[in-house]
């Protein structure tokens, strides 16, 4: 696995995972922010952990497969024996919406498309790469439900639930999605999962030794 450091969405540098450092990408489907990256890495003085984005990329059979984009939330230096290491925790791009809070009571006008309101909140959160599935549902009354200080992720997911959409989630390429809930059925199968080392479950628990 390669750990790219993105600056302005362009590869700027790379992080090197330490052997035995527990570098891992995990997915928790029912969490508000679903993807997480954690582990210990070699120090890299060129990385700005306040603004840069981390993108793990897994190569299988010569095909590069990105595993999302991550916002560092906790980065500090510790010592592993005689060597200094960077201990890092980061979360997927929906974390931007969780950390973005409204400063005044949010007003949503009657007749506003739910999807338009969700798109506006995503942009206000700093999320620019997103896909919101089209829907003609509109607000049936003026809304001022959310107090100042409410995070935008809470509002987005509440609006999504009202039109039977899933909570927002990030795909492997780093695009944030808001899409309609669909009941599982054989007709709806679009992805086939395998067991073994290439399974999604394996990837969600992968530990890297470099």
What is the meaning of each model-derived region?
Residues 1-50, 89-97:
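Juxtamembrane "anchor/assembly" segments of surface/extracellular structural proteins
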Residues 3-5, 37-39, 54-58, 72, ...:
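Hydrophobic beta-strand residues in large extracellular and virion-surface proteins
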Residues 9-12, 62, 173-174:
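Detector for glycine-centered tight turns/loop "hinges" at secondary-structure junctions
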Residues 15-22, 71-73, 195-199:
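A structural signal for short, hydrophobic beta-strand segments that form beta-sheets
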Residues 28-32, 47, 63, 79-81, ...:
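Sterically constrained small-residue positions within well-ordered secondary structures
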Residues 42-129:
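Surface-exposed cap/loop segments at beta↔alpha junctions
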Residues 74-97, 131-205:
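Short beta-strand-centered interaction patches in the first periplasmic/extracellular domains
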Residues 206-210:
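Conserved small/polar residues in nucleotide/adenosyl-binding loops
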């Amino acid at each position: 696995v390669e750990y790219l450091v993105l600056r302005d969405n362009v590869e700027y540098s790379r992080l090197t995972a330490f052997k035995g450092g527990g570098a891992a990408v995990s997915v928790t489907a029912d969490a508000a922010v679903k993807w997480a990256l954690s582990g210990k890495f070699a120090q890299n003085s060129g990385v700005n952990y306040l603004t840069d984005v981390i993108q793990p990329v897994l190569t299988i059979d010569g095909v590069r497969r990105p595993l999302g984009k991550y916002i560092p939330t906790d980065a500090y230096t510790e010592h592993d024996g005689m060597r200094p290491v960077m201990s890092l925790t980061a979360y997927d791009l929906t974390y931007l919406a969780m950390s973005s809070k409204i400063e005044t009571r949010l007003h949503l006008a009657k007749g506003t498309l739910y999807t338009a309101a969700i798109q506006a909140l995503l942009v206000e959160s700093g999320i620019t790469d997103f896909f919101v599935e089209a829907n003609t549902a509109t607000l049936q009354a003026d809304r001022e439900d959310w107090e100042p200080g409410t995070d935008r992720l809470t509002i987005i997911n509440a609006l999504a639930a009202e039109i039977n959409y899933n909570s927002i989630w990030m795909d492997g390429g780093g695009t944030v999605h808001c899409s309609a809930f669909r009941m599982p059925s054989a007709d709806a199968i679009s992805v086939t999962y395998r067991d073994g080392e290439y399974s999604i479950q394996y990837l969600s628990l992968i530990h890297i030794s470099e």
